[in-house]
A protein has these predicted regions:
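Signature of N-terminal electron-transfer/Fe-S-associated modules in redox systems
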Residues: 1-130, 171-172
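Structural signature of FAD isoalloxazine-binding scaffolds in flavoprotein oxidoreductases
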Residues: 2, 146, 153-172
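Residue-level detector of functional hotspots within protein domains
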Residues: 25, 151-152
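A residue-level structural signature of the nucleotidyltransferase/glycosyltransferase Rossmann-like core
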Residues: 39, 143-144
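Alpha-helix capping/helix-boundary segments
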Residues: 82, 150-151
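Noncatalytic alpha-helical scaffold of FAD-dependent oxidoreductases
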Residues: 122-142, 159
C-alpha cells in the first residue's frame, strides 16, 4: 500500500484477483474449505501471504506460518482456520495453463533506465550501476530507495515532497 508506482516498472503485479486462472488458486480453495475467512477484510492480505508461501514451496511449520502471516491482522477467526488452510493448501493442484505465457512476456520487457518528473520532483530507475552513479553525482541531496517502508512513509504519512529519488531495488 506504500509502494511507489514507479518501482513496478518491468515487473508483474500479482493481486488476489489475479490468482484465479479458470478455477480458484489452491490457497483460495484452502481458505474456502477451511472456513478461513469471515468478514473478508483481512482475506486479501492473508491470501497473498499464503500465495508467497505456496509459490516458494515453504514448509507450513508453525514458525513459517507465523512469519508469513506477520503484518496481517484478523479480528474474527482467531487464526486457527487460517492456519489450517495454510497447512492444507498443498493438497490442492494448481492450474498452470497461463504461467508459461506470463513468464515469456515478462522476459520480453525491455529494462531501460527511466526518469519521471513533475513540477516538484524527479524519480529515477536505473538498471545498471554506471548510469546510477552518473545521475546520482549530478543530483546531490537525493534519496536512495530500495524497499521503501521508511522513505515512502515520508510521502504517504508526513506528506513530504522528496525532490529526487533514485530507486536502486532493480539495480543489477
Amino acid at each position: 500500500c506504500i509502494t511507489f508506482l514507479y518501482t513496478l516498472n518491468g515487473k508483474q503485479l500479482v493481486t488476489v484477483e489475479n490468482l484465479r486462472n479458470g478455477d480458484l488458486h489452491p490457497v483460495q480453495k484452502a481458505m474456502v474449505e477451511s472456513d478461513g475467512s469471515q468478514c473478508g477484510f483481512c482475506t486479501p492480505g492473508i491470501v497473498m501471504s499464503m500465495y508467497c508461501m505456496y509459490e516458494n514451496k515453504v514448509k507450513p511449520t508453525n514458525e513459517n506460518i507465523d512469519k508469513y502471516l506477520s503484518g496481517n491482522l484478523c479480528r474474527c477467526t482467531g487464526y486457527i482456520p487460517i492456519k489450517n488452510s495454510i497447512k492444507n493448501m498443498y493438497n490442492y493442484k494448481k492450474n498452470n495453463s497461463n504461467q508459461n505465457n506470463i513468464i515469456t512476456l515478462l522476459k520480453k520487457i525491455k529494462r531501460n533506465d527511466i526518469m519521471i518528473e513533475n513540477n516538484e520532483s524527479r524519480f529515477f530507475v536505473h538498471y545498471n550501476l554506471k548510469g546510477l552513479i552518473k545521475d546520482y553525482q549530478k543530483n546531490k541531496n537525493s534519496y536512495l530507495l530500495v524497499g521503501g517502508t521508511d522513505l515512502a512513509l515520508e510521502v504517504t504519512k508526513k506528506r513530504n515532497n522528496l525532490k529526487n529519488i533514485f530507486y536502486i531495488g532493480s539495480n543489477k
